[in-house]
Amino acid sequence: MNAKGIALVATLALMVVIALLVFGTFFTTQIELWTTRNDTTSVQAFYAAEAGLQKYKAALFQQYVWREQRGGTGGGGGCFTSLARGLDLDRDGTITPFVNNRLVLAQNEVVTDANGNPVGRYTATLYKDAQDDQLFTLVSEGTSGGAKARVQATFRISNSDYLEQAIFAGAGQANKWLNGGATIRGGVYVVGNPNDPDQYVIEANGNFALYNRYDLTTYSEVTNRVEPSYRQVQDLCASLRVQYGKISVGGSTQIGEPNNKVKGVFVGRGAQDITGENVGVCRNNKGVCTEAMGGFDLSDPPPFPTLDAKLDSDACSAYPTWRACLQGKAALRIQRIGNILSVASPPNATLSPSCLQAMQSGTLTLDTQSVDCTFTRLDGSRGGFRYTYTGGQELLEVFGDVVLEGIDAVLNRPVDYRAQSGSAKSATLAVLKLGGNGGNLDINGNLLPDATFGLFPNHALGFVAEGDIYQRGQHVMAPVYAGGTFRVVKGNVLFASVISNQFCTTSAGNQMSCNASQKAEVVYIRIPKENRPALLPSLRGGKPSGIPWGGARE
């Protein structure tokens, strides 16, 4: 048999992989003995090789999901997967590392037929790309008698979870969901509207750009707020995914660059949902500079997270809804019902009079008056939040997760923040609706981590607004969730991730419309999983996505 060069379709069936998790780590490989003419041993060698490929392809995805569920995966700012450091196939805590980007998974493993008779052996070897920690090649070499066969598959394995993107968006609005002069450095994921798959969720006819890199030296005002290893990343493993909807690429739009392509563009039903053509780059690929392009590729995609749906995250999986999780996990929870403010939890907390007075109107405005909403917990640690006005660079300290219900929040001045939950330098500040009131956040000045307390992303404060978030401050360094619209004024930059139903650029801070021609930016700085604000949206084990890059057999 000589089938060199024939493509092997490497279909990565994630639903099958998840099912395999229920029945154990590995499964016994068996094949039905198939003979053709007099070339039995050649056929058996090929099927031995194919058995090794399929077994360890499934095992790799099982390993990935298990590692993501365990946490502590680490990783830096660029392309990363928890498999990059090696594998723990026995799940005993001992990782077998790659040696020169090579790891032998099985040596002369026996393959039997349905009757238990040995028909061949295979050796399976995994190769990691030297430049890209998400790209792997699995090679399986089979033997039977004197015959030999070899099959291989190259694939990318990554996580499509909420905070693995620069922007994760919901249904958006009809027409021009993301357009004009916005610059996105990192991946974009749009759920879209299943009832309107012909809607354009991205109609990019201006200077819209989606890049796979960033260099914070071009943002000199914030460079010293970020860990040195995160200040410049040349490969973010960025992809563009649209579950329902179309994109249009025109004008001087850039999606990827010829010398730094995005990893994939996966839109709706495929090529028919990618229309238009931009000027001068990647002309043979509809003006899209990408390593792979096709229809939406996830079999079990993550939904847009909402407060009254269950959130299957590590922190919230035991709660019926994300709202209930926020309420139950909060170190401090304050409610405003009508004109009455109360501390919903913890019971018997003693707060400064300035705390509830600051929210009496229904809006907590952090401006020229200090506000102290801290208290001493039973273990002696501090809980709640405190805003200190100094007349220069103000300070917001958050101790544990804070939930404000029926209240809007406004940060009116440039603010440094300090976030702490136990030993972690992270926390979540949430504003939720109650009785039709509250749930919105305005950020009117710079909002950055206090570098004397810790550098981003190992020091991060997350924000949740059930309604809208409006960024008028030039630089905001925090992951944010807006159940409604995230608005950002032209010339402003958010560093981290945006999860919002709609992303909107505006021409000025008093505008509610989404202006197509305004240049604003989102720069994706990846937060290590172990330091992500625990109550922000996430999914246990992430959402693994496997992109087949091709295969061969011989």
What are these regions, as identified by a protein language model?
Residues 120-330, 434-440, 444-446, 456-457, ...:
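Short, ordered "entry" segments at domain starts
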Residues 39, 98-112, 178-181, 200, ...:
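Low-complexity, repetitive regions of proteins mediating host interaction that are extracellular
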Residues 414-424, 429-431, 435-457:
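Sequence/structural signature of small/polar-enriched beta-strand/turn repeats
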Residues 156-160, 393, 415, 419-421:
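Short boundary motifs at domain starts and secondary-structure transition points
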Residues 393, 399, 424-426, 458, ...:
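A general structural motif
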Residues 170-179, 186, 192, 324-326, ...:
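Extracellular beta-sheet-rich ligand-binding/adhesion modules
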Residues 2-171, 192, 524, 529-554:
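Beta-strand/loop motifs with alternating small/hydrophobic and polar/acidic residues, enriched
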